A protein has these predicted regions:
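Short aromatic/hydrophobic "clamp" motif used to bind/position activated sugar donors
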Residues: 102
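Acceptor/aglycone-binding surface of glycosyltransferases and processive sugar-polymer synthases
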Residues: 78-96, 110-193, 209-228
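Short helix-capping segments at alpha-helix termini
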Residues: 40-45, 69-74
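N-proximal low-complexity "stem/linker" segments adjacent to membrane-targeting elements
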Residues: 1-37, 45, 324
């Protein structure tokens, strides 16, 4: 069994590889083989641990992690009592890492784990946040265009600049983890949260590979939901636009009323516009519903925050003591 000793006297920094998984049994053997190869190449520069968070998989994922944890003390894992969502699983896993630097990697191997070495070099140079910038990705034209549009909208509406073509493939310093731990958001959008924290940040361009095995857990619906979370968590622009639009409509209504009075005074014989009146009423109802929907999105997030729902509930763990479990 490979032993990992974490000590303040150890001159080498500890790098935690954080890996959220959901039904990734087909990818775990290849992922583990590549991670151990990287750890062997970097053993003179740093120590490593591999921290998995299982988002309540229903395949052999947890069994495979159990076997790995028995053979290798560097493998640590937590399993949630239910699927708590991708972003929350990442945040929960961050809280259970011990590294001086933490590298986020997806189990599907689309983001090459070997880039840990390049990320580590940037971290040693003093950067606290290093993210991968996707030059190209093996997806269809429609999905790529949809993602680019989403990145553009989020960047334009967000109050803090969020890097475009950037996912969750990143390395962050322990200081960033400590700040994230203090926020304890129950509905996080980590790209926006980390971008808004400041610190010394940089990006490394790379080409994304095709998924090795299994199926992607993201579809259009989940991408839209994630995009809405990004906008409403990190921007007050929709709320201010709703207020501004209300003022504009009120101004137009006043002008319309004045025009109507003027016309009726000087042209009393003109037929009254029943159809136009109904159209205006329907327009007003639709506009009010839209604006109330925007306000409702913000109220929903306030409700979720006040409800104090835990980020995740840990059902099982591997190579963790009870004192080390944070949730």
């Amino acid at each position: 069994m490979t032993q990992l000793t974490v000590s303040k006297k150890t001159p080498k920094p500890l790098v935690s590889i954080s890996i959220p998984v959901l039904n990734e049994a087909a990818n775990i053997p290849a992922l583990y083989a590549r991670l151990t190869g990287i750890a062997a190449r970097m053993q003179d520069r740093c120590a490593m641990e591999f921290v998995f968070s299982d988002n309540h998989s229903d395949d052999q994922t947890w069994s495979l992690l159990t076997d790995l944890a028995k053979r290798d003390d560097r493998v640590r894992a937590i399993r949630f009592s239910k699927n708590c969502g991708f972003q929350r699983s990442i945040l929960a896993n961050y809280l259970h890492t011990r590294g001086d630097a933490v590298m986020q990697i997806d189990a599907d191997l689309q983001d090459p784990p070997e880039m840990v070495e390049a990320f580590f070099d940037r971290w040693k140079q003093g950067y606290q946040v290093i993210y991968g910038i996707r030059r190209k990705r093996p997806e269809g034209i429609f999905i790529n265009a949809f993602r680019k549009l989403g990145y553009w909208v989020i960047d334009k509406l967000s109050e803090s600049p969020i890097p475009r073509d950037v996912g969750d493939f990143r390395m962050i310093d322990r200081k960033v983890i400590d700040v994230l731990a203090a926020t304890r958001s129950s509905n996080p959008y980590l790209r926006g949260m980390i971008a808004g924290l400041g610190f010394n940040q940089t990006g490394i361009p790379y080409d994304r590979d095709a998924r090795v095995a299994g199926e992607s857990k993201f579809n259009i619906t989940r991408l839209v939901r994630l995009g809405l979370t990004a906008v409403f968590n990190h921007s007050t622009v929709p709320l201010r636009m709703a207020s501004l639009l209300g003022i504009v409509i009120l101004f137009i209504s006043v002008l319309g009323a004045a025009y109507y009075v003027f016309v009726r005074l000087f042209y009393p014989d003109l037929p009254r516009g029943f159809v136009s009146t109904q159209i205006l009423i329907l327009f007003g109802i639709g506009l009010n519903s839209f604006l109330l929907g925007i306000i409702g999105e913000y109220l929903l997030r306030i409700f979720v925050m006040l409800r104090s729902e835990p980020i995740a509930i840990i059902e099982q763990s591997l190579n963790f003591s009870d004192q080390e479990l944070k949730l």
